[in-house]
Amino acid sequence: MAKTAAKVRKKVKKNVAEGIAHVHASFNNTIITITDRQGNALSWATSGGAGFKGSRKSTPFAAQVAAEAAGKAAQECGVKNLEVRIKGPGPGRESAVRALNALGMKISSITDITPIPHNGCRPPKKRRI
């Protein structure tokens, strides 16, 4: 019994003028996802995916490289205006926003959406270095 060849679907190129850049900056990594207004992902990049491993992932430079990669992919989809939403306490917060701005994208607003507990779960113990 011969197998029929699977139909190859051509990837539909999205053309979106406005987008939202979600920057998730943890202590260990930085994840940048650029979505349209409805929340559908257009492009994404991480510090680890940009070639940084171990403790180098948690540097501002790694976040900058990841933001440039995500931004260039989003520009191919036609994104020109961005709204930035930052979540997390990581070191890559500022540099990711600066990298997106340096690509020539117009940033309309920067919002910090870091979740803050109203006395919820007990936090992890303090680090002793």
From Swiss-Prot:
Name of protein:
Small ribosomal subunit protein uS11
Query: GO CC annotation: what is one?
Result: ribonucleoprotein complex
> One GO molecular-function annotation for this sequence?
structural constituent of ribosome
UniProt keyword RNA-binding, yes or no: yes
Domain of life per record: Bacteria
What are the BP-aspect GO terms? translation
Q: What does this protein do?
A: Located on the platform of the 30S subunit, it bridges several disparate RNA helices of the 16S rRNA. Forms part of the Shine-Dalgarno cleft in the 70S ribosome.
Family named by the database record: Belongs to the universal ribosomal protein uS11 family.
In terms of InterPro entries, this protein maps to: Ribosomal_uS11 (IPR001971), Ribosomal_uS11_bac-type (IPR019981), Ribosomal_uS11_CS (IPR018102), Ribosomal_uS11_sf (IPR036967)
Quaternary form? Part of the 30S ribosomal subunit. Interacts with proteins S7 and S18. Binds to IF-3.
Which keywords does this chain's UniProt record carry?
Answer: Ribonucleoprotein, Ribosomal protein, RNA-binding, rRNA-binding
